[in-house]
């Protein structure tokens, strides 16, 4: 992934660490480092988002913003490893029953506590066919108890293998042992969502005046096809380590426009997928501002082997 960033935004080192994970989250400022007076970030996000509801999103632009607005049980560190998020610790019994111990100081942006019941509601909502989440199947990857029947409409969402043992203890029961289960929990789809806001505002709960989030940032402004502005969430449990006070996401789809607006000083961070010719040119002209970061991605072929598919039939011996 190719990114261009201005070093003047924050001190060198801190900025590069923030950009590596492609989200403006909290960071430890190295001793002796002097930060710039104005801690704001304007970044291109590649396109207009389809939704800010963690259960309705499926694209990279949406995920970029959701990682700033919402925090799940676990999050990814700078090297892509799962580390504590809302859950400060966790344990399991035979990799089948997992228990997550939530931070007692975790709060929503309105100041109310984030509880285990929030995760029960959120995961049940994710699995519920009525939600029509494109990532409902993600819970199937974790083999949660009863998830297959719930998604198929054979059982109610309340039968999902999740339980709040108390306000700060969330228990998950799987249908079989899954040693890697905790690693799945960095995905945006398993972030908590605010039941009260959803029940009050319905599909409009993600509008700036209605939304409640639990991440390092909260939604300040959303002008469709123009900008989305996030501001620091002072109720976030790790707010003291949040470096950037405001983040503005722009929906610029043209790579050329993206780079031109960066070079004119309108944005601080470009999107990726830069044409090779442009990359080579900029690498020579502004080598200290062009960064190539690892990109975690999986490509695969999915074969349609249904008996009524002509090509599949022709390929059979």
What are these regions (language model features)?
Residues 81, 148, 153, 159, ...:
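Gly/Pro-rich hinge or "lid" segments in bacterial periplasmic/extracellular proteins
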Residues 47-63, 86, 134, 181-191, ...:
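A structural "hinge/loop" feature
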Residues 1-25:
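Gram-negative bacterial Sec-dependent N-terminal signal peptides
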Residues 25-42, 78-79, 83, 149-155, ...:
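N-terminal hydrophobic or amphipathic helices and topogenic motifs
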Residues 36-40, 47, 68, 85-87, ...:
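Extracytoplasmic
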């Amino acid at each position: 992934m190719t990114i261009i960033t201005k070093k003047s935004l924050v001190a060198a080192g801190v900025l590069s660490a923030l950009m590596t994970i492609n989200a403006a989250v909290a960071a430890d400022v190295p001793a002796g480092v002097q930060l710039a007076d104005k801690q704001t970030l304007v970044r291109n996000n590649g396109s207009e988002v389809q939704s800010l509801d963690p259960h309705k999103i499926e694209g990279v632009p949406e995920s970029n913003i959701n990682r700033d607005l919402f925090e799940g049980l676990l999050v990814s560190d700078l090297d892509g490893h799962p580390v504590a998020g809302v859950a400060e610790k966790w344990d399991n019994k035979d990799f089948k029953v997992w228990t997550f111990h939530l931070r007692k100081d975790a709060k929503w942006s309105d100041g109310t506590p984030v509880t285990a019941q929030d995760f029960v509601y959120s995961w049940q909502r994710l699995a519920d066919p009525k939600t029509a989440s494109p990532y409902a199947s993600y819970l199937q990857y974790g083999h949660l108890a009863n998830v297959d029947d719930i998604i198929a409409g054979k059982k109610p969402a309340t039968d999902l293998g999740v339980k709040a043992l108390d306000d700060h203890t969330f228990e998950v029961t799987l249908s079989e042992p899954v040693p890697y289960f905790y690693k799945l929990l960095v995905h945006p789809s398993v972030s908590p969502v605010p039941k009260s806001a959803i029940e009050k505002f319905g599909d409009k709960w993600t509008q700036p005046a209605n939304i409640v989030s639990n991440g390092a940032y909260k939604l300040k402004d959303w002008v469709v096809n123009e900008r989305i502005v996030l501001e620091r969430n002072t109720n976030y449990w790790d707010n003291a380590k949040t470096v950037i006070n405001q983040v503005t996401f722009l929906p610029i789809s043209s790579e050329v426009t993206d780079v031109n607006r960066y070079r004119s000083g309108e944005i601080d961070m470009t999107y990726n997928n830069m044409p090779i010719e442009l990359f080579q040119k900029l690498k020579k002209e502004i080598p200290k501002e062009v960064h190539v970061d690892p990109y975690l991605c999986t490509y695969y072929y999915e074969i349609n082997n249904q008996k009524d598919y002509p090509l599949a039939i022709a390929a059979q011996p």
